[in-house]
């Protein structure tokens, strides 16, 4: 559990799921300004973390990944009674209107298209956290 040194509040736990190692660490640096960040390289690794007791406040996931993609992860979470309430932000290069609709229907609360600005991602994560409260 991480504590904000300025406010004394507990920082939210953010799970970032991304197969591109460079982008994964860049996203971690961005989101570390607002929360405690845990990383997974694909949907299977994320699901393993979640099923072994890790409880994030929000998940940020890429859509296209090996082993288990973000869409399958979102659908799996949505169908799981214990994990279905976790807010999910999709972060992906697939930015067409139908891609966004598919992501939202799969369980994502927000959709961020790559390339993206740090402020846009942080804004969507904050909105997902607020909606969860």
Predicted regions and their residues:
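Conserved acidic carboxylate
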Residues: 18
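Acidic, metal-coordinating helix/loop segments flanking the phosphotransfer/catalytic sites
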Residues: 39-58
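Receiver (REC) domain active-site loop signature in two-component systems and cognate sites
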Residues: 65
């Amino acid at each position: 559990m991480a504590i904000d040194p300025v406010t004394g509040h507990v920082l939210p736990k953010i799970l970032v799921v991304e197969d591109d190692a460079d982008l994964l660490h860049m996203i971690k640096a961005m989101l570390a300004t607002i929360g405690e960040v845990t990383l997974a390289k694909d949907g299977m690794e994320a699901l393993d973390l979640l099923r072994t007791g890790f409880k994030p406040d929000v998940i940020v996931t890429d859509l296209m990944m090996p082993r288990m993609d973000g869409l399958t992860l979102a659908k799996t979470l949505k169908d799981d009674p214990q994990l279905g309430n976790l807010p999910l932000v999709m972060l992906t290069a697939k930015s067409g209107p139908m891609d966004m609709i598919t992501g939202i229907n799969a369980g994502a609360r927000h959709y961020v298209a790559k390339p993206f600005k740090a402020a846009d991602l942080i804004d969507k994560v904050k909105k997902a956290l607020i909606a969860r409260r």
